[in-house]
Amino acid sequence: MSHGLLIVVHSRTGAARAMAEAAAAGAAIERELPTRLLAAEAAGPDDLLAAGGYLFAAPENLAALSGAMKDFFDRCYYPVLDRLNGRPYAALIAAGSDGTGAARQLARIATGWRLRAVAEPLIVVTGAQTPEAILAPKHLPAPDLARCEALGAALATGLAGGIF
């Protein structure tokens, strides 16, 4: 089995990126476990195949995954179908008010790949509700980033210890 944690992220305003970077910092607790943080636009099937577990980080736009993250899944879906079965994953969603639509969409894709969810989706709600607030750069509170860091650490520990 391949090893390592792959974190795939798309972010327009910085929230999902900050979440992914916090998770990567948490994953660094396992020094022997390779952790890669890739932009969704740069990640591909070979990156998925080379990893033993995944963390997907994206904003929710209009109750769905952001376009670039959806494009990542569209590009990779069939090339890795039936080749990732049973591998663990978790999700980080940055949302203005809800996040559950994107989380459900990601879970459906992961089910098709036969991935195994090892944590509930971690949704950070920014409260952005006006066009100006939605488009503005985001700076997340320390407690939200700490939750992301803890999830990254848990995934890395589970992978390194053979728990997942």
List the model feature ranges, each with a label.
Residues E41-V125:
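Helix-loop-strand module that forms the ligand-binding subsite of alpha/beta enzymes
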Residues T13-G14, I93-D98, P141:
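Short histidine/acidic/glycine/proline-rich micro-motifs that form metal-
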Residues R31-A42:
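A short beta-strand-loop structural module common to alpha/beta enzyme folds
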Residues G4-L6, R36, A90:
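A structural signal for isolated positions on well-ordered beta-strands in alpha/beta enzyme cores
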